[in-house]
Amino acid sequence: MSSINGIDNIKFDYEFSNSLYYRNSIFFSIIFFIIYKKSSYITENFFGELVKKAYTTLTEKKKLEWDQRVVSMIHAFLVLPFCIISAVESFKYGDIFYFQNDSLLMVLSISSGYFIWDLIICYKDPKLVGTPMIIHAIMGLSSNIYVALPHGRPCFVPIVAILLITEISTIPLNMKGFIQVVNSKSKYYNWSLGAFVITFLVSRCIIGLPFDIYLVYGCIQRWDVFPMDKSLVFITECGIQFFLNSYWSFLLIKKLYQTYLNPIPNHKKNED
């Protein structure tokens, strides 16, 4: 144990390996590309006739969306356990702004590999994913690489893992997308929709938005401790993330209002 400018209870005996991080990131990006390329084969051969029939009737654009969901789902399942472990250990050792261990290295490696894949997909077909998702991919990769740079490390490293816990909403979102294609009238569609709404609003809005503000405040409190360039990048990305989560939360709440709470009856038309 040691202390840096008043930051106590931090483990400094862990050696972060740059070469291992870069190798792992490339390895996982290759894995995600392989899954993406083989997604159609996996879907048509390992998920039963009902799923196969639904998938084969999709347009090429819809098939690409399905394949992207497969990769997104696998990334969420892979990274979430390491995010939770990292978050618990970061809180345990006293400062979520400054900590590093094997779990955090895995979080950075898996998510960097995913964001490399994601950014290339966005570059190849930007109209398919949309501007907000392109910004999301750029932010994800740039923040991962920047916190892994040697100067000032491990400042902000734990926060990457904590913020990626919001990927928990990705799982029901993708399940909703899969079920909508296979059988939109299934009771599981409504269950997955409800799970998505709850996990998204709780993780990204109710907790996420105040947490973004806290992170900026915490960064300012440590202004003299961490490298200025990393602090500026961190604050900028927190601001963009706050905007994106606010925007997505607004769209979701608006959709819920229009669907369930719209005060104007749908049958009311052309009254005299």
Curated annotation (Swiss-Prot):
Pfam families: TRAM_LAG1_CLN8 (PF03798). The keyword Cytoplasm does not apply. It is a multi-pass membrane protein. Coiled coil: none annotated. GO terms for biological process: lipid homeostasis. It is found in: Membrane. The chain crosses the membrane at residues 16-36, 71-91, 103-123, 128-148, 155-175, 196-216, 233-253. SMART domains: TLC. Keywords: Membrane, Transmembrane, Transmembrane helix. Its main location: membrane. Residues 61-261 form the TLC domain. The keyword Signal does not apply. One of its GO terms (cellular component) is endoplasmic reticulum. It comes from the Eukaryota. Belongs to the TLCD4 family. This is TLC domain-containing protein 4 C. It comes from Dictyostelium discoideum (Social amoeba). The gene is tlcd4c.
